[in-house]
A protein has these predicted regions:
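Conserved beta-strand core positions
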Residues: 4, 26-28, 54
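Short glycine-/aliphatic-rich beta-strand segments at the starts of folded cytosolic domains
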Residues: 1-8
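Amphipathic alpha-helical interaction surfaces in cytosolic regulatory modules
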Residues: 12-27, 35-50, 70
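Electropositive phosphate-/nucleotide-binding environments in soluble metabolic enzymes
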Residues: 8-11, 62
Length: 78
């Protein structure tokens, strides 16, 4: 299981990340230690506190991981 930390600054960011997650050949969950939602569920994000960094978790190959990190670079917490 891989995980990255992401953060969103607007509804548009959430929508774009949700669309990005839907294009992946693997499932992505986003949330906190306590609450997790499917990253393709735009409405699911509204059950989370998106003002704070969130953890995105997924299980994928090394190639898919590298490609996803490139595509999701804007959302990564540095």
């Amino acid at each position: 299981m891989r995980q990255i930390t992401v953060q969103f600054t607007s509804f548009r960011d959430i929508r774009e990340f949700s669309v990005l997650a839907a294009r992946q050949p693997f499932q992505i969950t986003v949330g906190t230690e306590k609450y997790k939602v499917n990253a393709t569920s735009f409405l699911g994000f509204f059950t989370l506190n998106c003002r704070r960094p969130l953890i995105a978790q997924f299980d994928c190959s090394e190639e898919d991981y590298a490609r996803f990190l490139e595509e999701a670079a804007y959302f990564l917490v540095k």
